[in-house]
């Protein structure tokens, strides 16, 4: 009953468009940047030149999502720093 009262002024097409925007925004800002971080962390020292070029292109493309996670991720190499 409550859901019908809230969604009755909004058409089903508008809700589908809103859901598509939320899905694409979540992919662009959360899912792909996290996958890109993990892929670059594993492959950084063994990338070829074309793979590195594509990684730089993807960093440029997904920069807003990467900058959201930058304060929380530590990708330093093991063995760096004071003991």
From Swiss-Prot:
This enzyme's EC code(s): 7.1.1.-
InterPro entries: NADH-quinone_OxRdatse_su_L
Coiled coil: none
Localization: Cellular thylakoid membrane
Topology relative to the membrane: Multi-pass membrane protein
Enzyme class: translocase
Transmembrane segments: 15-35, 53-73
Summary of subunit composition and partner proteins: NDH-1 can be composed of about 15 different subunits; different subcomplexes with different compositions have been identified which probably have different functions.
General function of this protein: NDH-1 shuttles electrons from an unknown electron donor, via FMN and iron-sulfur (Fe-S) centers, to quinones in the respiratory and/or the photosynthetic chain. The immediate electron acceptor for the enzyme in this species is believed to be plastoquinone. Couples the redox reaction to proton translocation, and thus conserves the redox energy in a proton gradient. Cyanobacterial NDH-1 also plays a role in inorganic carbon-concentration.
UniProt-recorded name of the protein: NAD(P)H-quinone oxidoreductase subunit L
Organism: Prochlorococcus marinus (strain MIT 9303)
């Amino acid at each position: 009953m409550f859901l019908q009262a809230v969604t009755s002024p909004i058409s089903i097409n508008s809700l589908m468009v809103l859901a598509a925007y939320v899905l694409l925004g979540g992919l662009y800002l959360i899912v792909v940047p996290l996958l890109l971080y993990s892929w670059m962390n594993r492959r950084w020292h063994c990338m070829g030149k074309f793979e590195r070029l594509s990684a730089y292109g993807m960093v440029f493309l997904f920069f807003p999502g990467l900058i959201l996670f930058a304060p929380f991720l530590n990708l330093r190499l093991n063995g760096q720093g004071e003991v």
